[in-house]
From Swiss-Prot:
GO terms for biological process: early endosome to Golgi transport; endoplasmic reticulum to Golgi vesicle-mediated transport; intra-Golgi vesicle-mediated transport; vesicle coating; vesicle tethering. Expressed in all tissues examined. This is Trafficking protein particle complex subunit 10. It is linked to Neurodevelopmental disorder with microcephaly, short stature, and speech delay: An autosomal recessive disorder characterized by global developmental delay, short stature, severely impaired intellectual development, microcephaly, poor or absent speech, and behavioral abnormalities including autistic features and aggressive behavior. PANTHER family: EPILEPSY HOLOPROSENCEPHALY CANDIDATE 1/TMEM1 (PTHR13251), TRAFFICKING PROTEIN PARTICLE COMPLEX SUBUNIT 10 (PTHR13251:SF3). Its main location: Golgi. The modification Phosphoserine is found at S708. One of its GO terms (cellular component) is cytosol. Belongs to the TRAPPC10 family. Residues 1189-1222 are annotated as: Disordered. Keywords: Autism spectrum disorder, Disease variant, Dwarfism, Epilepsy, ER-Golgi transport, Golgi apparatus, Intellectual disability, Phosphoprotein, Transport. It comes from Homo sapiens. Specific subunit of the TRAPP (transport protein particle) II complex, a highly conserved vesicle tethering complex that functions in late Golgi trafficking as a membrane tether.
Length: 1259
């Protein structure tokens, strides 16, 4: 090694720093390969795997190759990484054994001893093979021998630390392969050294950071250590990792400042609390500001120096990462944070110094970004930089106000001295910006030099900022800057220029509902309008401010007094009115009508009471309050009757008005509800709660800007309506808050009156509510006299007195003495006169006016009712009793039903009348004194009863049953029931079986009356009866009149019993009881009970040898399906017409169920020849062929499977070939002529023994 080499120059902290690699051995050899080495080393990337699970990265390695010297090796405690040699290389091209032993081996030994002394283990021996040198040497060992000797002597445990580079200056494949192997080894060793040394450095750095709570710990010292790591990452071109180091330092320092503000301060922070003496802004045009770095190292830096240097390094790295817009974002945060940190640390700052520093820093950042981006990029990223423009504008404005550059008279001597001090604190301009025409330093110095220069610079910045905000859609921010601009113009006595900006800002704040900015802007606008002489606009704004509760009471009173002062001044032009909207002066809360339904007749008095809520802070004397009313006549005036108006108007007469939404828009009330959610952030290690809070998920919906095409302020040009109809109240004092004001008017013309506009006059100032909403109307009517008659109950009942209410609405007619109602009497309806009847007179508001006795005079045809005297638009009410005579049903109304089967009769009766009462209408004609025409009314009465009758038999004994059903809701008392024969029968007696003379009948219930029929001779063929019963309401006291009884007439025919039918079932022979599935014997006995009667003389009657007989058809059916009839179930017999004549019929039946079973039904029919014209027309299922019928049990065939069935009705036995032939006809015998003596009899059937499933019939 050549010890006479010159020492290395000191390290310069620039971006050209590279990792240091020392070179020992043959320097000339290294010099020859250096160009190729420095070119080839960074060409191929290498994967760098770092510790602590950090993601691997591909890096290109570069190195700074320097001559090896012992002074370069780090001493104990030295943490400098930039001067740290990461690798030591020894170069030799020795191929001679003698030379190796004489010099090279000793040199290698010394080199390794020095490295071992300094604990350096990162080294490499490079043996360069040169073919030309071999040819010149005759006695040389093979190459492998020298390599093996070096490896044995120095690398016996690390053979990979010795590499061979073959002919590095030649261009051959062997040379290229040698270079590739060498470069790979070199990169690998370098990365291993980086990983090892950086890991150790990071561990030491973390150890130092963990000692930050110990006394004597210095942030500046730690700053230098971590920045050393950042320099190494930057040297390796790992700019992201380098930026992370500065961000960690930034966060650590910020946390200490916050803790200091909370009372937990560190001692070393006192170094940064020294007063600020220089405010020359950020320096971003140098890679490293060595001056500020050295001041930090010496612990002499101020807070601004530290923040400036830290941000300059972050800016440099962000620009290398091509993230210039993040520079702007971070710069804005930095400037705001620095202002707050100076306050927290209570650092002494001269007035305006911080404004200068912020202004210079904003422009410095903007110019630095402009220097690395083209115009298109800048224009498309205005959103990132506009905040800096706005902040610079704000600080320049503050400097202008501070230095007296905005005042009307210009700066004074004190302002000038302050300006000189601020410019002195800037110091001399930096060399890197000295030749820049528009440097931040020159701009600030020029702006503070004169009033004109300041105005130029401030207006340029303001207009540029407004234009930028507008271009990106941030209208609110643009209006805020415009508002500052308006304040500037007001100070410059140019209100005409300020108004447009104030109006724009106010419009935006109103659209978005910002209460406090609205108030502040209106105050500025009021001052502007006052200077411009805009009286009407100024009064409108003053009224809004006087009602604004965000102002103090004194401010509100001031603006209210401005309005009152103007109103008290005499007007130059009499009659001139200044019309202002009312919502700021007072609000209409509610309105109340008296009468409450807002309906009044012509000539009546209507009161309208309104509640006005005064917004003014002091009592205000109002000369008059006027309500303009619009009069209209309904086209469909027939609807506007008093009855219609009364039913369709509000009952309480109170109308509430929605509160005014000014100064906020309607859209604010329709914003979506807040969607608030809890947020928890827990530690991933132990799940402990770190932070909690509330987040709003729909903030983008709540804070979005809402455009409005028109101004949301109430326009001052409100039209004042002039009309013939007004409600007026004069000389009213409106106290702050709610005030009751009453208007009175007398109705003159019928129609609808709509309240349109509310006005209040204070001198020549009129406050107007242009539209009263919701719509408020009152109606004036002129009514014709009317008569209404209606029952007091839901329905009128016939036969008992019922009360009817008469209502006379006088309308425009006046009832005079002697006026009466003339009622024509109906035949079946009586009007009952009572001495105590009285008439009551009511006003149209249903208040009782008078009461008088009712005089009623009756004659045969007319009933006269004298009316009491009553004025117009009153109501007369009185009640009368009427009685409708109950009408009896038509004769024989149900007599034709008695000859038919009982079920069919009941069905028809129900279908005809159902459960409804029979009604009767009575029409009455009434002559009224106010009309030449008669009024016809109809009263409907309902018969409360429904009556039916039936014939009952017990052998030859006969009974008549009458059922009276009460269909009404009242209870009645029945008495004196009678049943009489209206025919000519003298030997017939009706014996009543009801012994009670009086019997109650309740609502929806029935009462039955029974009489037995007795006769001594032959009974008559028919019986004509009349049933009558007296009735009266059960709840009434003794009536003043006697009521007519209720009557019912009916007719009974063919009621004498001719035949007795008896059926009996016998078990099979040898059995005591019938069994299921076994054939049993059915015996039917038909007995004639009388000799020949008049009713027997028909086509079925035949005569032979003075004996008469008739043909009957019997049928056995089982409707309950308990029995199966085997064989033929019907037949025709010839029955002698003589008393006690008997015919027996035998057939077999089979029980289908076990238990007590009722006997099958046996029916009898008259068998009429086909030519009979008097027989009933039955359906085809009732036609029975004579040849197929048999009454002889022994002549029947044995039953088969097809004939074993249950019979439910008469079945046809004719074949298809007989369908077209004339058939005999059947006529059912009336129910009174046949008596079934076995009806209700049951037979015990026991189950068969072999049945697995037992079915039992229970009846």
């Amino acid at each position: 090694m050549d010890a006479s080499e010159e020492p290395l120059p000191p390290v310069i902290y620039t971006m050209e720093n590279k990792p240091i690699v020392t070179c020992a051995g043959d320097q000339n050899l290294f010099t020859s390969v250096y160009p190729t080495l420095s070119q080839q080393l960074p060409r191929e990337p290498m994967e760098w795997r770092r510790s602590y699970g950090r993601a691997p990265k591909m890096i290109h390695l570069e190195s700074n190759f320097v001559q090896f010297k012992e002074e370069l090796l780090p001493k104990e405690g030295n943490k400098a990484l930039l001067t740290f040699p990461f690798l030591h290389i020894y170069w030799t091209e020795c191929c001679d054994t003698e030379v190796y032993k004489a010099t090279v081996k000793d040199d290698l030994t010394k080199w390794q001893n020095v490295l071992k002394a300094h604990s350096s283990v990162d080294w490499l021996i490079v043996i360069v093979e040169n073919d030309a040198k071999k040819k010149n040497k005759t006695n040389i060992l093979p190459r492998t021998s020298i390599v093996d000797k070096i490896r044995n002597d120095f690398c016996n445990k690390q053979s990979d630390r010795c590499v061979v580079l073959s002919d590095p200056l030649k261009d051959s494949s062997r040379t290229q392969e040698s270079w590739n192997a060498f470069l790979t080894k070199l990169r690998t060793l370098l990365l291993m050294s980086f990983t090892k040394n950086l890991g150790k450095f990071e561990d030491d750095m973390r150890t130092l950071r963990e000692k930050r709570t110990e006394p004597g710990w210095s942030f500046c010292e730690y700053f230098m250590v971590q920045e050393e790591l950042a320099f190494v990452f930057e040297m390796l071109q790992q700019f992201e990792d380098a930026l992370v180091q500065y961000d960690e330092l930034d966060a650590l320092f910020s946390q200490y400042v916050v803790n200091f503000g909370a009372g937990d301060g560190a001692n070393w922070l006192t170094f940064f609390c020294q007063p600020v003496k220089s405010w020359n802004g950020l320096i971003l045009r140098k890679p490293i500001d060595m001056e500020k770095r050295e001041s930090i190292q010496r612990r002499e830096a101020t807070l601004l120096d530290l923040r400036s240097y830290l941000f300059s390094r972050q800016c440099t790295l962000l620009l290398f990462l091509q993230r210039p817009w993040e520079v702007a974002q971070r710069a804005l945060e930095l400037l705001h944070n620095c202002v707050q940190e100076l306050k927290l640390l209570e650092v002494s700052v001269p007035p305006g110094a911080l404004d200068c520093w912020v202004f210079l820093s904003c422009l410095e950042v903007l110019q630095r970004i402009e220097g690395c981006c083209d115009r298109a990029q800048i224009d498309s990223n205005i959103a990132h930089t506009v905040g800096l423009w706005s902040y610079a504008t704000e600080k320049l404005k503050s400097l202008g106000y501070l230095c007296g550059l905005v005042s009307e008279k210009g700066p004074n001597s004190e302002d000038l001295n302050r300006t000189v001090d601020l410019l002195a604190g800037l110091g001399a301009e930096r060399p890197e910006t000295a030749n820049t025409a528009q440097s931040p330093y020159k701009k600030l110095k020029e702006a503070l030099s004169s009033v004109e220069a300041f105005e130029k610079h401030y207006l340029d910045l303001s207009h540029a900022t407004i234009e930028m905000y507008t271009s990106i859609g941030r209208i609110r921010s643009a209006k805020f800057v415009g508002k500052d601009l308006a304040e500037f113009y007001m100070r410059k006595k140019a209100p005409q220029k300020a108004e447009i900006y104030l109006q724009g800002a106010l419009k935006n704040y109103l659209a978005e509902g910002w209460a406090l900015p609205i108030t502040h802007t209106r105050k500025q606008l009021a001052e502007c309008q006052k200077h411009l002489g805009q009286i009407e606009n100024y009064l409108q704004t003053s009224s809004l401010l006087a009602s604004d509760h965000h102002l103090t009471e004194e401010e509100r009173k001031h603006f209210c007094q401005e309005i009152l002062d103007f109103a008290s001044q005499p007007s130059d032009s009499p009659g001139h009115k200044i019309v202002l909207p009312m919502h700021s002066f007072a609000q209409l809360r509610d309105l109340h009508f008296d009468p409450s339904n807002a309906v009044v007749h012509v000539g009546g008095v209507l009161c309208v009471e309104i509640t006005m809520y005064s917004q003014m802070p002091v009592p205000v004397h109002v000369e008059q309050i006027v309500v303009n009313v619009h009069f209209s006549i309904e086209k469909n005036s027939y609807r506007k009757t008093a009855e219609w108006l009364t039913k369709h108007k509000t009952s309480n007469g109170i109308i509430n008005f929605p509160p005014e939404t000014a100064p906020f828009p309607v859209s604010q009330n329709s914003l979506p509800a807040l969607e608030l959610y809890e947020m928890f952030e827990r530690s991933p290690s132990d799940n402990s709660l770190n932070t909690t809070g509330i987040i709003c998920r729909n903030v983008h919906m709540l804070l979005r800007r809402q455009e409005s095409s028109s101004s949301l302020e109430m326009p001052s040009g409100v039209a004042l309506e002039e009309g013939a109809h007004v409600l007026r109240c004069s000389h009213v004092t409106l106290e702050p808050g709610a005030n009751q004001i009453t208007f009175r008017t007398q109705a003159k013309e019928p129609g609808t009156y709509t309240l349109r506009q509310l006005c209040a006059s204070v001198g020549s100032v009129w406050f107007v509510l242009p539209h009263i909403y919701p719509i408020v109307q009152y109606d004036v009517y002129s009514q014709e006299p009317q008569l209404h008659v209606e029952p007091l109950a839901d329905s009128l009942l016939a036969g008992i007195p019922q009360r009817v209410k008469f209502t006379v609405t006088t309308g425009h007619y006046t009832i005079k003495n002697g006026d009466s109602l003339q009622l024509s009497n109906a035949e079946a309806m009586l009007i009952l006169c009572q001495a105590e009847s009285r008439a009551v007179v009511y006003s149209n508001t249903r208040e009782q006016s008078s009461e008088a006795a009712l005089r009623i005079q009756s004659s045969d045809k007319v009933t006269s009712i004298s009316l009491p005297v009553a004025p117009a638009y009153h109501v007369i009410e009185f009640e009368l009793e009427v009685l409708s005579l109950p009408s009896a049903p038509a004769l024989g109304g149900e007599s034709d039903m008695l000859g038919m089967a009982e079920p069919h009769r009941k069905h028809k009766d129900k279908q005809r009348t159902g459960r409804c009462m029979v009604t009767t209408d009575h029409k009455v004609s009434i002559d009224c004194p106010w009309s030449i025409y008669s009024t016809v009314i109809a009263l409907t009465f309902s018969v409360p009863f429904r009556t039916t009758h039936s014939l009952l038999s017990s052998g030859t004994r006969k009974y008549v049953q009458v059922c009276v059903q009460n269909l009404s809701e009242l209870d009645f008392q029945l008495s004196d029931s009678y049943l009489v024969d209206t025919g000519d029968s003298t030997d017939l007696q009706l014996v009543p079986l009801n012994t009670q003379s009086q019997q109650p009948i309740y609502s929806k219930q029935s009462v039955f009356f029974v009489w037995e029929l007795k006769w001594t001779e032959e009974p008559p063929p028919s019986l004509h009866c009349r049933f009558s019963v007296g009735f009266s309401p059960a709840s009434e006291e003794q009536l003043s009149i006697s009521l007519k009884p209720y009557t019912y007439e009916f007719k009974v025919e063919n009621f004498f019993t001719l035949y007795n039918v008896k059926a009996e079932i016998f078990p099979p022979s040898g059995m005591e009881y019938c069994r299921t599935g076994s054939l049993c014997s059915l015996e039917v006995l038909i007995t004639r009970l009388s000799d020949l009667l008049e009713v027997d003389k028909d086509e079925a009657l035949t005569e032979s040898d003075e004996h008469f007989s008739t043909k009957l058809m019997y049928e056995v059916v089982d409707n309950s399906s308990n029995w199966a009839v085997c064989g033929k179930s019907c037949g025709v017999i010839s029955m002698p017409v003589a008393a006690r004549a008997t015919h027996r019929v035998h057939m077999e039946v089979m029980p289908l169920f076990a238990g007590y079973l009722p006997l099958p039904d046996v029916r009898l029919f008259k068998y009429l020849p086909h030519h009979s014209a008097h027989s009933s027309q039955l359906d085809a299922d009732s036609w029975i062929e004579n040849d197929s019928l048999s009454v002889d049990k022994h002549g029947d065939d044995q039953p088969d499977s097809s004939s074993l069935k249950s019979r439910g009705s008469v079945h046809s036995a004719c074949s298809s070939e007989h369908k077209g032939l004339p058939m005999p006809r059947l006529q059912a015998l009336p129910a009174g002529q046949v008596f079934n003596s076995s009806s209700g009899t049951q037979v015990l059937v026991i189950p068969s023994q072999d049945d697995h499933v037992l079915e039992v019939s229970v009846t």
